[in-house]
Amino acid sequence: MSNKGQTLQDPFLNTLRKEHVPVSIYLVNGIKLQGQIESFDQYVVLLRNTVTQMVYKHAISTVVPARAVNFQVDVPAE
C-alpha cells in the first residue's frame, strides 16, 4: 500500500481505537462484522466484540463508525 493511503487510514483507525467507537465493518463478500477496533497494522485489524477477531484489510470493503468522528490528517510536504 502506498504511504499516501496510510496517511488517511491510520489516523482514522487510530481515532476509532482510542475513542472506543463501535464500528460496523463490511467485508467484500457482504458479511457485516461489529465491534470495537482493538489494534491494527499494515495488513490486519483486530476487532473486539465478545471475542477478538483478526480481519485482513484486503477483505474489508467499508468501515462505518456508529457516530461521527473527527480526526487529524498529517499531510506531508511535497
Swiss-Prot record:
Signal peptide coordinates: none
Listed CDD domains: Hfq
Gene Ontology molecular-function annotations: RNA binding
Family: Belongs to the Hfq family.
Ranges for domain Sm: 10-69
Organism: Bordetella petrii (strain ATCC BAA-461 / DSM 12804 / CCUG 43448)
HAMAP family documented for this protein: Hfq
InterPro entries for this protein: Hfq (IPR005001), LSM_dom_sf (IPR010920), Sm (IPR047575)
The protein's name in its UniProt record: RNA-binding protein Hfq
Function summary: RNA chaperone that binds small regulatory RNA (sRNAs) and mRNAs to facilitate mRNA translational regulation in response to envelope stress, environmental stress and changes in metabolite concentrations. Also binds with high specificity to tRNAs.
GO cellular component entries: cytosol
Keywords: RNA-binding, Stress response
Biological process annotations from GO: regulation of DNA-templated transcription; regulation of RNA stability; regulation of translation, ncRNA-mediated
SUPFAM superfamilies: Sm-like ribonucleoproteins (SSF50182)
KW Nucleus (keyword) present: no
Keyword Glycoprotein part of the UniProt annotation: no
